[in-house]
């Protein structure tokens, strides 16, 4: 089953510009290869206040996403030290 990707507006505006180009390409390849095919296999479910969300580890970066039917909603692509705080803020 193929999954469609949808990105939170802040991913393009805030997250991606701060990531070096070579890492951006690596992240794009991982997201495209893993999250569009088997996100529940490659991702790890989050716990606590972020229960219902998943993470994909790509080096020191984390891609936080939510599964909604055949859609993968990407909330953040940030360094592991700041990603969970940013996701909590984006969720309001």
Model-derived regions: residue spans:
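A short, surface-exposed loop/turn module that caps and links secondary-structure elements
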Residues: 32-57, 85
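Enriched for short, Lys/Arg-rich terminal
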Residues: 2-6, 25, 58, 66-92
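Generic leucine side-chain signal with a strong bias for well-ordered alpha-helical environments
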Residues: 27, 35, 46, 75-78
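Alpha-helix boundary/capping and short turn/kink residues
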Residues: 20-24, 40, 77
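Residue-level recognition of oxygen-bearing side chains
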Residues: 10, 51, 82
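Arg/Lys-rich, positively charged N-terminal/basic patches that mediate binding to nucleic acids
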Residues: 1-29
């Amino acid at each position: 089953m193929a999954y469609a990707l949808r990105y939170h507006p802040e991913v393009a505006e805030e997250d991606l510009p701060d990531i070096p180009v070579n890492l951006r390409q690596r992240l794009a390849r991982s997201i495209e290869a893993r999250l569009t095919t088997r996100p529940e296999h490659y991702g790890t479910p989050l716990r606590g206040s972020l229960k219902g969300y998943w993470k994909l580890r790509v080096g020191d970066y984390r891609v936080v996403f939510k599964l909604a039917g055949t859609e993968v909603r990407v909330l953040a692509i940030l360094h592991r030290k700041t990603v969970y705080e940013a996701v909590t803020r984006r969720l309001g």
